Design a protein with these regions (language model features):
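UBC/E2-like fold recognition across ubiquitin and ubiquitin-like conjugation systems
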Residues: 1-59, 69-194
């Protein structure tokens, strides 16, 4: 078995143990070592602005794909083609994510799949915002984020509030309910991933 297949199997085993009340995922490809995942986040994120006020939407599907060069190269992480897409300083206009782990990717070692999913969730729910190296320079969004979400301490930027103005909420655990459908929205409280 190749190093790639070993790592993909390990990533899949990690995902089978990972749980979140606001995330659904499915593996695509080889049943023991899948190289693609669809991960749906049932969180509220900003999709635009109306007179300086954020417009939000809940429910985003993210595709995580491992190339033939994995684990030497990081996986491709992007939103699927279904719109609306969230706008965020750390999501490129073409839907690719600029993850914190990108700067720390060590060829052959990488970042575990559950940590990647955690980072994506924190970005979508505006719990993680890096405006210093913004992938998306949308001026209205950056201005709103600076005024409402972040404060700076020395060289660091910290999130002071998730999305406008109250924290994001988690659904109660109820396997019979599919959160994020058009007619249901989760009750509000801070999201914990994993």
């Amino acid at each position: 078995m190749s190093v790639r297949e070993d790592r993909l199997m390990a990533e899949y085993e990690t995902m089978k143990k990972w749980r979140s009340r606001v995330v659904e995922w499915r593996a695509i490809g080889n049943s023991k070592s899948p190289d693609k995942y669809e991960v749906t986040y049932h969180v509220k994120s900003i999709i635009g602005f109306d007179n300086g006020r954020p417009l939000t939407h809940t429910g985003f599907k993210v595709i995580i794909e491992f190339s033939g060069d994995y684990p030497r190269v990081k996986p491709d992480v992007h939103l699927d083609s279904q719109r609306p897409w969230p706008i965020h300083p750390n999501i490129w206009p073409d839907g690719r994510f600029c993850l914190e782990g990108d700067q720390h990717w060590i060829p052959g070692v990488g970042v575990p799949m559950d940590a990647i999913c955690q980072m994506i969730g924190e970005i979508l729910s505006y719990q993680e915002v890096n405006i210093r190296s913004a992938a998306n320079g949308n001026a209205a969004m950056i201005d709103w984020v600076k005024k409402n979400l972040v404060f700076e301490t020395g060289s660091n930027t910290k999130v002071k509030n998730p999305i406008d103005p109250s924290p994001i909420r988690l659904p109660d655990i109820d396997d019979s309910v599919k959160w994020g459908t058009d007619d249901q929205e989760p009750p509000q409280q801070r999201i914990v991933f994993g």
